[in-house]
Regions:
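Hydrophobic or amphipathic alpha-helical targeting/insertion segments
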Residues: 12-55
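Short coil/turn segments at secondary-structure boundaries
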Residues: 7-8, 132
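General structural concept
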Residues: 4-7, 14
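Acidic/glycine-rich beta-solenoid
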Residues: 14, 61-63, 75-119, 127-274
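Asp-box/BNR beta-propeller loop motif
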Residues: 25, 72-75
Length: 274
């Protein structure tokens, strides 16, 4: 896809189109909008695109995003934000990034302000750090640490919001030997943790979740279809072949009734017909 026009562009200015430019490996390196000098038909634009690498006709072009691949060497169009090691996370990054997106520069719509986001990888191609400009005019940095299986066991988000304030959000996760989440902890600026835990049955289905002090149980029927969730704030039931409100029974997996209740309020129900 090299050029497209949506309904808003057509209605506002029939000469305005969205465009995409590609590199020699057929990857998008620039996207934006162009206002053509004259109104062109689809056939004329298709002919230009099919016969020349310079397929965008004359007009005023406004780039909205540039993408850099394969290298951490900045170009005229795309800067690169520096990697900074974070204690407890990767001390370095891989430079073998052929085929990977390394940096993206994006325009804030309606302005001449650009935001740059650079992504760093380990030698397995996993993201270990992203460094990006934020709308406050400062830098945000996200670090990730993995276990041998590739699960994220730690993540740290650092967002500088003023010259004197940086907010830090930290996550820690644990998994079982099948890669399923067992527990997670989140802290903001070193404060009290928000915790969650998960319990599974013998066939691997999630049957219990606990968020802080609120516990939710999850039920299934013998076919593995979800039949209900229950916690103090909210309860719900799904019925299939066993409706209680006069709806026709469904034996093929369609839901016949959905009942829910908030706290101690009266239960409500939908019945479905197919």
């Amino acid at each position: 896809l090299v050029m497209s026009q949506d309904g808003n562009q057509r209605a506002g200015d029939s000469k305005k189109w969205s465009y995409s430019l590609y590199d020699g490996k057929n990857r998008v390196v620039e996207t934006g909008e162009v206002v053509l000098t004259t109104t062109s038909t689809h056939a004329a634009l298709q002919s230009a695109a099919s016969s020349s690498l310079n397929y965008i006709p004359g007009g005023t072009r406004t780039a909205l995003q540039y993408t850099l691949y394969d290298t951490y060497t900045a170009t005229t169009d795309v800067p690169v934000r520096a990697f900074v090691p974070t204690t407890g996370y990767s001390a370095g990054y891989s430079t073998l990034v052929t085929g990977l997106v390394t940096s993206v520069k994006t325009r804030v719509l309606g302005t001449d302000t650009w935001l740059v986001a650079t992504t760093y990888y380990d030698d397995r191609g996993r993201v270990i750090q992203t460094v990006s400009d934020n709308l406050r005019g400062f830098t945000s940095r996200v670090d990730m640490k993995y276990d041998f299986a590739g699960n994220v066991v730690k993540q740290r988000e650092s967002h500088r919001v003023s010259a004197s304030q940086t907010d830090v959000l930290e996550h820690e996760n644990s998994y079982d030997d099948r890669g399923r989440l067992l527990s997670g902890t989140t802290r903001l600026n070193g404060g009290a943790p928000a915790t969650e835990s998960c319990t599974y049955d013998a066939v691997g289905r999630l049957i219990k979740q606990k968020h802080g002090n609120v516990e939710e149980t999850i039920n299934y029927n013998t076919r593995g279809w979800l039949t209900g969730k229950e916690s103090i704030p909210f309860k719900m039931k799904l019925r299939y072949e066993n409706p209680e409100g006069g709806t026709a029974a469904c034996w093929n997996g369609n839901i016949s009734e959905w009942e829910w209740q908030h706290g101690t309020s009266a239960a409500l129900m939908y019945g479905f017909m197919y």
